[in-house]
C-alpha cells in the first residue's frame, strides 16, 4: 500500500488537475504528490495559557514532517478555557467544545483525505476531542500534549489554579487578608501550560501515553521546557512512520489498552472527567466499555502517586520521579497492565518499559512502590442507588468522612448554589444538590470547581456533601458526587429531591447515593413531575442539549444507533 493511499484520491489522474492546481498555489511540487499528506491539528490560542505555548510545538512538528518526506497540512482547532469560564454561563460551552473539536478534526482530515494526523492540544477538552476524532476516523494519528504548567510560588508554597479558587472561600470567611489573596491570584500561574496537578488535562495526557497514543515521558513534560519541543518533533516523525506502516488508532485503542489507561488514571489519582471522556473515546473507537468497567479496574489498582488536588505534588514533580513510564513499570510488574498492547512506536508496552527501573528512584515520595501504596484501591468510584440508577462518579480516597447523611439543600443552578455558599448559608452536615446542570438540562454539564473550592476554603470540604448532574473539575476534592444519571432534565430521581429531604452519600463500602424517602413518596413525586422547557432553543447549546446522550454513556452527540 502506498504512503499516500488516501491523499492520492485528490492528487492523481487527469480529472484531479484542478485539485493539483490548488496545491501548486501552496508551493507544492509534482514530486510532493507522491508523499503522504499529514494534518497538523494545531490548538494554539491566546485565549488561555494552556494553549498559548502550542505554536512552537506545531512548528517543530511541521519541520519534522517535512524532513521525513511528507507534506504538513496545518489547520486550527478551537478551545475553551475552563479556568476562565468557570462559574459562568461560558462553562456550558466547555464540554460542547469536546464535540466541536472532534468534529473539526474529522471534518478537515476526512474532507482533505489526509494520510495521517498529528493532534496538538492543551486545555482539558482538547484532549478527548482530539482522541475521539482519531478513533472515529481510524486514520494514523498521534496526540501531542502541549505540556503542563510549572507551579507558582508564594510564601514557600507551590500554587496551582485551584489555590486561587480555594482562596476565594478563605477570603470570604475572613481567614485570609487582601494582600495574600491578591498575591495568590497573581502568582498562581507563572507561564504557559495546562493546570499543574493531576487535573483533567494531565490526567488525560497520562492516560493517552499509557494507552500508547502518545510518546513515552511526553505527558508530564512542562510546556516551557525544550524537551517538549523535541518530543513534538519526534512525535511527528513517529507518526509519518506509522503512516508508512499503516498502524492505525484502532490497532492501538483496544479494550486492553483502555484498561491500561484507566489503571494509570487510578494509580495517579486522576480526574473524575476521565470517566466521561473514556466512555466517549471507547464509543468513538467502537470498543465495548461501560461505566461499570471503571469500578472493575478501581477495585484492583492502588493509588501510588501523591499528586494534587488531594495530594502534595504536581506533574513536574512526577516527571522528575520517572513520569508515567515509572508508574507503568510498577503496575506491569504487579500484573496490573497488559504488556502486549501495541503502541504508536510499533513497540509493545512491555518492550517500551524494558529499560525503566523496577522501583521508583530513592529520595522522592511522589511515586510509591505497590507495597507502600497510598490507598489499596483506586479513587474514582461508581456509586449507584435510588438517586442514580445509571451510576455517578465520586472521588473517595482521602475522605475523613466517607459516609454522610444530611438535609438536602436544593439548587436548580450552580449560580444559585454559589450565592448560598458565599452568603454562608450552608452548614456542617448539609448535602448540597445542584441539578438542571446535566448534558441536556444545562445544557453542557458545567464543572463545579467554584462551589466546591469555596466550600473547602470555608472549612466545609470534609463536612458538607455535594451532588450534581453536572461535572467537577479535575481540581475538585471532598465529599462530591457528579455525573448523576439520569439527569434532572429527563426526569432522573435527582429531579424529585425537595429541600430538607434526607440524602445519604456512602462512598465507603456500599457505594450508594440514596434519597431517604419511601417508594410510595418517590412514585407520587414522579407522577407530579413535569419536564422543564429547554433553556436554549437556538445555537450550539441547543444543538448539544438535543443530541447529547446520558452521562453514563459519555454525553456524546453521535450515539444514534444505541
Swiss-Prot record:
Pathway: Amino-acid biosynthesis; L-isoleucine biosynthesis; L-isoleucine from 2-oxobutanoate: step 3/4; Amino-acid biosynthesis; L-valine biosynthesis; L-valine from pyruvate: step 3/4
UniProt-annotated catalytic positions: 473
Domain of life: Bacteria
EC number in record: 4.2.1.9
Matches recorded under InterPro entries: DHAD_IlvD/Edd, Dihydro-acid_dehy_C, DihydroxyA_deHydtase, DiOHA_6PGluconate_deHydtase_CS, ILV_EDD_C, ILV_EDD_N, IlvD/EDD_N
Modified residues (N6-carboxylysine): 125
UniProt source species: Bordetella pertussis (strain Tohama I / ATCC BAA-589 / NCTC 13251)
Keywords from the UniProt entry: 2Fe-2S, Amino-acid biosynthesis, Branched-chain amino acid biosynthesis, Iron, Iron-sulfur, Lyase, Magnesium, Metal-binding
Catalytic activity: (2R)-2,3-dihydroxy-3-methylbutanoate = 3-methyl-2-oxobutanoate + H2O; (2R,3R)-2,3-dihydroxy-3-methylpentanoate = (S)-3-methyl-2-oxopentanoate + H2O
Cofactor: [2Fe-2S] cluster; Mg(2+)
Gene name per UniProt: ilvD2
A GO biological process held by the record: isoleucine biosynthetic process
Summary of subunit composition and partner proteins: Homodimer.
PROSITE patterns membership: ILVD_EDD_1, ILVD_EDD_2
CC cofactor note: Binds 1 [2Fe-2S] cluster per subunit. This cluster acts as a Lewis acid cofactor.
Molecular functions per Gene Ontology: 2 iron, 2 sulfur cluster binding; dihydroxy-acid dehydratase activity; magnesium ion binding
Binding site for Mg(2+): 82, 124-125, 447
Record function comment: Functions in the biosynthesis of branched-chain amino acids. Catalyzes the dehydration of (2R,3R)-2,3-dihydroxy-3-methylpentanoate (2,3-dihydroxy-3-methylvalerate) into 2-oxo-3-methylpentanoate (2-oxo-3-methylvalerate) and of (2R)-2,3-dihydroxy-3-methylbutanoate (2,3-dihydroxyisovalerate) into 2-oxo-3-methylbutanoate (2-oxoisovalerate), the penultimate precursor to L-isoleucine and L-valine, respectively.
The protein, known as: Dihydroxy-acid dehydratase 2
Binding sites annotated in the UniProt record for [2Fe-2S] cluster: 50, 123
Family under the similarity heading: Belongs to the IlvD/Edd family.
Amino acid at each position: 500500500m502506498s504512503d499516500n493511499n488516501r491523499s492520492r484520491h485528490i492528487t492523481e489522474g487527469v480529472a484531479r488537475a484542478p485539485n493539483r492546481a490548488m496545491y501548486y498555489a501552496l508551493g507544492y511540487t509534482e514530486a510532493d504528490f507522491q508523499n503522504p499528506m499529514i494534518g497538523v491539528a494545531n490548538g494554539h490560542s491566546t485565549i488561555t495559557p494552556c494553549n498559548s505555548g502550542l505554536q512552537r510545538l506545531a512548528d517543530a512538528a511541521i519541520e519534522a514532517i517535512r524532513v521525513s518526506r511528507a507534506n504538513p497540512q496545518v489547520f486550527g482547532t478551537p478551545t475553551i478555557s475552563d479556568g476562565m469560564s468557570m462559574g459562568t454561563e461560558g462553562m456550558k460551552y466547555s464540554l460542547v467544545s469536546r464535540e466541536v473539536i472532534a468534529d473539526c478534526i474529522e471534518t478537515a482530515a476526512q474532507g482533505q483525505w489526509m494520510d495521517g494526523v498529528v493532534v496538538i492540544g492543551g486545555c482539558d477538552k482538547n484532549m478527548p476531542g482530539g482522541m475521539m476524532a482519531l478513533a472515529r476516523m481510524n486514520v494514523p494519528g498521534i496526540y501531542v500534549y502541549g505540556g503542563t504548567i510549572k507551579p507558582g510560588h508564594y510564601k514557600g508554597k507551590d500554587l496551582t489554579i485551584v489555590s486561587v479558587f480555594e482562596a476565594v472561600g478563605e477570603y470570604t470567611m475572613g481567614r485570609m487578608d487582601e494582600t495574600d489573596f491578591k498575591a495568590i491570584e497573581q502568582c498562581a500561574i507563572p507561564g504557559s501550560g495546562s493546570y499543574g496537578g493531576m487535573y483533567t488535562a494531565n490526567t488525560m495526557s497520562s492516560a493517552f501515553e499509557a494507552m500508547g497514543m502518545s510518546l513515552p515521558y511526553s505527558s508530564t513534560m512542562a510546556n516551557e521546557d525544550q524537551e517538549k519541543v523535541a518530543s513534538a518533533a519526534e512525535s511527528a516523525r513517529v507518526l509519518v512512520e506509522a503512516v508508512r506502516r499503516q498502524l492505525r488508532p484502532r490497532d492501538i485503542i483496544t479494550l486492553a489498552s483502555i484498561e491500561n489507561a484507566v489503571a494509570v488514571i487510578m494509580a495517579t489519582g486522576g480526574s473524575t472527567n476521565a470517566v466521561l471522556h473514556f466512555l466517549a473515546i471507547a464509543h468513538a473507537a467502537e470498543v465495548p466499555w461501560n461505566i461499570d468497567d471503571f469500578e472493575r479496574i478501581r477495585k484492583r489498582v492502588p493509588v501510588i502517586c501523591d499528586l494534587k488536588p488531594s495530594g502534595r505534588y504536581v506533574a513536574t514533580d512526577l516527571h522528575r520521579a520517572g513520569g508515567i513510564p515509572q508508574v507503568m513499570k510498577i503496575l506491569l510488574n504487579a500484573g496490573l497492565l497488559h504488556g502486549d498492547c501495541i503502541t504508536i512506536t510499533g513497540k509493545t508496552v512491555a518492550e517500551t518499559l524494558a529499560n525503566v527501573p523496577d522501583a521508583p528512584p530513592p529520595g522522592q515520595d511522589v511515586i510509591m512502590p505497590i507495597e507502600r501504596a497510598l490507598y489499596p484501591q483506586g479513587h474514582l468510584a461508581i456509586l449507584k442507588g435510588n438517586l442514580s440508577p445509571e451510576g455517578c462518579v465520586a472521588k473517595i480516597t482521602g475522605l475523613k468522612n466517607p459516609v454522610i447523611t444530611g438535609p438536602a439543600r436544593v439548587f436548580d443552578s450552580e449560580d444559585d448554589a454559589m450565592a448560598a455558599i458565599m452568603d454562608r448559608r450552608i452548614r456542617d452536615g448539609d448535602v448540597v444538590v445542584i441539578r438542571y446542570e446535566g448534558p441536556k438540562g444545562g445544557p453542557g454539564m458545567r464543572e463545579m470547581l467554584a462551589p466546591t473550592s469555596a466550600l473547602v476554603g470555608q472549612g466545609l470540604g470534609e463536612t458538607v456533601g455535594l451532588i450534581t448532574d453536572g461535572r467537577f473539575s479535575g481540581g475538585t476534592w471532598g465529599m462530591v458526587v457528579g455525573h448523576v444519571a439520569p439527569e434532572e432534565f429527563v426526569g432522573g430521581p435527582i429531579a424529585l429531591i425537595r429541600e430538607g429531604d434526607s440524602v445519604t452519600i456512602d462512598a465507603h463500602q456500599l457505594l450508594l447515593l440514596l434519597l431517604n424517602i419511601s417508594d410510595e413518596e418517590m412514585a407520587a413525586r414522579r407522577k407530579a413531575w413535569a419536564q422543564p422547557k429547554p433553556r436554549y432553543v437556538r445555537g450550539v447549546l441547543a444543538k448539544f442539549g438535543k443530541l447529547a446522550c446520558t452521562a453514563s454513556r459519555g454525553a456524546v452527540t453521535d450515539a444514534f444507533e444505541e
